[in-house]
């Protein structure tokens, strides 16, 4: 039986997207990113200096932290204190890698950009929403450095965006929500630049393997969705 999307979307249709800039007062960049019912607060803090292993090399650094608030899901999640779960570590590394691909660290100078992605409400796609919102917040943080005379030009060299694609019953669905995510035979997360460059592909078969032809279709669908997300990012920055 063919899968019918619970919210009535077409297979190639994204959820409703919103980027609310300057959501909080103090970070250099602060964006509430929303994809459907998923909400992630993405902030960027600027710190002088770099990790010890980069000191004296004349370049900056960007790193990310990711957490889910206890009330982000129907059942309360315990806060992660001393030990992070493998999932949390994987996601925050993905966010950091993705955002570093967007920026020329040599043009940043010896300063560190700290990305914090806090999930307020989770309905699948939290890691991709975090990447998308963090890129918008990063733009605001860099604009602040330029306005303060700390930088003369932006080190951001490309826009980046991310989206998930699920295979359910052999058919690909763009930007799945939670009911679709739990039904997926294959779950893929794709991060791309604004010229179609691939930054990261995460693809996992939950039960049966998937074919190269299906992977190509997944990437085509992801590229289509990412182009729309990047347009929404740029619109939010106007």
Swiss-Prot record:
<keyword id="KW-0694">RNA-binding</keyword>
<keyword id="KW-0819">tRNA processing</keyword>
<dbReference type="GO" id="GO:0006364">
    <property type="term" value="P:rRNA processing"/>
</dbReference>
<keyword id="KW-0808">Transferase</keyword>
<dbReference type="InterPro" id="IPR015847">
    <property type="entry name" value="ExoRNase_PH_dom2"/>
</dbReference>
<dbReference type="InterPro" id="IPR001247">
    <property type="entry name" value="ExoRNase_PH_dom1"/>
</dbReference>
<keyword id="KW-0820">tRNA-binding</keyword>
<feature type="binding site">
    <location>
        <position position="87"/>
    </location>
    <ligand>
        <name>phosphate</name>
    </ligand>
</feature>
<keyword id="KW-0698">rRNA processing</keyword>
<comment type="similarity">
    <text>Belongs to the RNase PH family.</text>
</comment>
<dbReference type="InterPro" id="IPR027408">
    <property type="entry name" value="PNPase/RNase_PH_dom_sf"/>
</dbReference>
<dbReference type="GO" id="GO:0000175">
    <property type="term" value="F:3'-5'-RNA exonuclease activity"/>
</dbReference>
<dbReference type="InterPro" id="IPR036345">
    <property type="entry name" value="ExoRNase_PH_dom2_sf"/>
</dbReference>
<feature type="binding site">
    <location>
        <begin position="125"/>
        <end position="127"/>
    </location>
    <ligand>
        <name>phosphate</name>
    </ligand>
</feature>
<dbReference type="GO" id="GO:0009022">
    <property type="term" value="F:tRNA nucleotidyltransferase activity"/>
</dbReference>
<dbReference type="GO" id="GO:0000049">
    <property type="term" value="F:tRNA binding"/>
</dbReference>
<dbReference type="InterPro" id="IPR020568">
    <property type="entry name" value="Ribosomal_Su5_D2-typ_SF"/>
</dbReference>
<dbReference type="InterPro" id="IPR018336">
    <property type="entry name" value="RNase_PH_CS"/>
</dbReference>
<dbReference type="Pfam" id="PF03725">
    <property type="entry name" value="RNase_PH_C"/>
</dbReference>
<dbReference type="InterPro" id="IPR050080">
    <property type="entry name" value="RNase_PH"/>
</dbReference>
<comment type="function">
    <text>Phosphorolytic 3'-5' exoribonuclease that plays an important role in tRNA 3'-end maturation. Removes nucleotide residues following the 3'-CCA terminus of tRNAs; can also add nucleotides to the ends of RNA molecules by using nucleoside diphosphates as substrates, but this may not be physiologically important. Probably plays a role in initiation of 16S rRNA degradation (leading to ribosome degradation) during starvation.</text>
</comment>
<keyword id="KW-0548">Nucleotidyltransferase</keyword>
<dbReference type="InterPro" id="IPR002381">
    <property type="entry name" value="RNase_PH_bac-type"/>
</dbReference>
<dbReference type="Pfam" id="PF01138">
    <property type="entry name" value="RNase_PH"/>
</dbReference>
<comment type="subunit">
    <text>Homohexameric ring arranged as a trimer of dimers.</text>
</comment>
<protein>
    <recommendedName>
        <fullName>Ribonuclease PH</fullName>
        <ecNumber>2.7.7.56</ecNumber>
    </recommendedName>
</protein>
<dbReference type="GO" id="GO:0008033">
    <property type="term" value="P:tRNA processing"/>
</dbReference>
<dbReference type="GO" id="GO:0016075">
    <property type="term" value="P:rRNA catabolic process"/>
</dbReference>
């Amino acid at each position: 039986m063919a899968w019918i999307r619970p919210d009535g979307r077409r297979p190639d249709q994204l959820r409703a997207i919103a980027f609310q800039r300057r959501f909080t007062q103090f970070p250099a960049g602060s964006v509430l990113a929303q994809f459907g019912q998923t909400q992630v607060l993405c902030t960027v803090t600027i710190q002088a200096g770099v990790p010890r292993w980069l000191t004296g090399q004349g370049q900056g650094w960007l790193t990310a932290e990711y957490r889910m608030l206890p009330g982000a899901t129907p059942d309360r999640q315990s806060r992660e204190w001393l030990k992070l779960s493998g999932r949390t570590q994987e996601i925050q590394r993905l966010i950091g890698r993705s955002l570093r691909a967007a920026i020329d660290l040599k043009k940043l100078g010896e300063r560190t950009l700290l990305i914090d992605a806090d999930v307020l409400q989770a309905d699948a796609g939290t890691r991709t929403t975090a990447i998308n919102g963090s890129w918008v917040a990063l733009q605001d943080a860099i604009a602040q450095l330029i306005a303060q005379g700390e930088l003369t030009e932006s080190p951001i060299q490309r826009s980046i965006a991310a989206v998930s694609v699920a295979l359910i019953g052999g058919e690909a669905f763009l930007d799945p929500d939670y009911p679709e995510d739990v039904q997926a035979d294959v779950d893929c997360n794709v991060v791309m630049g604004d010229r179609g460059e691939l930054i990261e592909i995460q693809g996992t078969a939950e039960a049966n393997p998937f074919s190269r032809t299906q992977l190509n279709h997944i990437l085509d669908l992801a590229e289509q969705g990412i182009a729309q997300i990047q347009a929404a990012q740029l619109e939010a920055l106007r």
